[in-house]
Amino acid sequence: MRRNIILKAPAKVNLTLDVKGKRSDGYHELETVMHQVNLLDIIIISQAAGGIQIKSNSSLIPTNEENLAYQAAEMILGEYAHKEGVEIYIEKNIPVGAGLAGGSTDAAAVILGINQLYDLGLEEEELLEMAASIGSDVAFCLAGGSKLARGRGEILSKLPQRMIPYIILVKPDFQLSTAEVYRELDLTQVEEFPDNAAFLAAWEAYDIINIARNMRNVLETVSIRKYPEIAAIKAELIETGALNALMSGSGPSVMGIFMEEEQALKAREKFQTRYQEVFLLSSYV
């Protein structure tokens, strides 16, 4: 009987994102706090005689080697189980091109899933190394939880797990290219850089007010210039009661942190009149 395995693939938000400069390899040197939230893709991986096949409920994602999940399957099978194949079904719930690591989290789930499905017995360190070679966010998505990420995003330091109970996430009706945003980033134009030390102190103390107050993302400089609507969403989230609002990753998704469920529900209702993709989320634990 053919075995299959079902995994949850949580979205990622960046609670702070600083860029220290451009590296000799063309990547940017980052320092960012990444945090998983309970917006989930569902990944079903089934044994197959050979090859890799991807199907999805979404027409917005590729089902060939352009998909990071395909690349992840190709890498782990090629390295450790070259005679085996897989069929992968991606139930896509995370918005595409949104700064939420939707493709990366699917790839991480595929690495974990194939390791289990074919009893490969690979240790976390080996899986993380593989994940990092596929994409900058894939290692975090595999490790999960809350992490301070440096380098390209693959050098991870564990943070205490903290629950953020009410997050309103608004995905505007357009996409942004991560590569394009980084290409256009000019650090001399950034008006305010994150104080990651202050953020981490607030995180350690589980001080939600100062966690929110210290959220910053230098990539907003580029994304807001291209799409001023991002700044308008941020301002409106704060007007509706958010402690602070921030673009996640390279955008365009914007999240607001709320203390009270009632305020968060009202904000969701307000934004749902204008946007198709509005979510009330909390930390994924």
Curated annotation (Swiss-Prot):
Pathway: Isoprenoid biosynthesis; isopentenyl diphosphate biosynthesis via DXP pathway; isopentenyl diphosphate from 1-deoxy-D-xylulose 5-phosphate: step 3/6. InterPro entries: GHMP_kinase_C_dom, GHMP_kinase_C_sf, GHMP_kinase_N_dom, IspE, Ribosomal_Su5_D2-typ_SF, Ribsml_uS5_D2-typ_fold_subgr. It catalyses: 4-CDP-2-C-methyl-D-erythritol + ATP = 4-CDP-2-C-methyl-D-erythritol 2-phosphate + ADP + H(+). GO terms for biological process: isopentenyl diphosphate biosynthetic process, methylerythritol 4-phosphate pathway; terpenoid biosynthetic process. It holds the Pfam family GHMP_kinases_C. It is an enzyme of class 2 (transferase). The keyword ATP-binding applies. One of its GO terms (molecular function) is 4-(cytidine 5'-diphospho)-2-C-methyl-D-erythritol kinase activity. Its EC number is 2.7.1.148. Belongs to the GHMP kinase family. IspE subfamily. This is 4-diphosphocytidyl-2-C-methyl-D-erythritol kinase. It comes from Syntrophomonas wolfei subsp. wolfei (strain DSM 2245B / Goettingen).
